[in-house]
Amino acid sequence: MNKIHVTYKNLLLPITFIAATLISACDNDKDAMAEAEKNQEKYMQKIQQKEHQQSMFFYDKAEMQKAIANINAKGGANLAIIEVRFFKGGYSFIRQSVNTPAKVEVFKFNNGYWGGPSPVNLTIFGTITEEQKQEALKEALFKFDSINFSIIPERIQETIKRANASGIISVTEDSDIVVRAEIAHNGEFVYDITITAKNTARAVMTLNKDGSIAGYEIKEPFDPKKEAEKAQQLVEQSRKDIESQRKKAAGKMNEIQQTFKK
């Protein structure tokens, strides 16, 4: 009996040691994970601070004037474009290609440096020849100087204020911000500010060319289920439209046949 008891005690010691080692290892893993999370948070804060510093044109009117001057200097005199965008860290614009007037090219200023020109694929419906494309593009271009961009910092603050007052969405200066002025696919001019919250909800302020407010809305967070339902509704509506057109065509054909019978 004593021999068995002694053996049990001898076994208990290494088991206790192993358990203590495992607990210590788990604690070390937790500490390592906590340290990694802290380092990740610090890294993200540095990135955010850098983006903020490189996006002062969003918050300061004088900095916006510098950005406008920078775009004008890069684009050349009487700059005509089909799109300009301001985003966290920089801005970009798309102009008519100097060497190939039927095509367009993009210039992008990011992290303090210009990139481009880079070719952009442009589809203009109803055009076939290069001359037709060039003419259609000419009609779509608008003068960069015709848009009041200096008002952007003020309008961003107004958008943030309205968004937070709604109680539906919460945004700050550090939220994702995009300002665009462009000719949309339907040929209409669009000038707006979009601020996206962490939950992907968006506050959108639409502006006129002179910088006055044309509209404001809050768009719901992205919901895959709702988006799928919308897509299904569009498909169903398209089917109904096709069926309606088919019936009209059949009715018209029947009228023609009846006329010939007479």
Swiss-Prot record:
Residues 1-25 form the signal peptide. Disulfide bonds: none annotated. Residues 237-246 have a biased composition (Basic and acidic residues). Keywords: Cell membrane, Lipoprotein, Membrane, Palmitate, Signal. It is a lipid-anchor. GO terms for cellular component: plasma membrane. A lipid is attached at C26 (N-palmitoyl cysteine). The keyword Transmembrane helix does not apply. Residues 227-262 are annotated as: Disordered. It is found in: Cell membrane. A lipid is attached at C26 (S-diacylglycerol cysteine). Its main location: membrane. This is Probable lipoprotein EnvF. It comes from Salmonella typhimurium (strain LT2 / SGSC1412 / ATCC 700720).
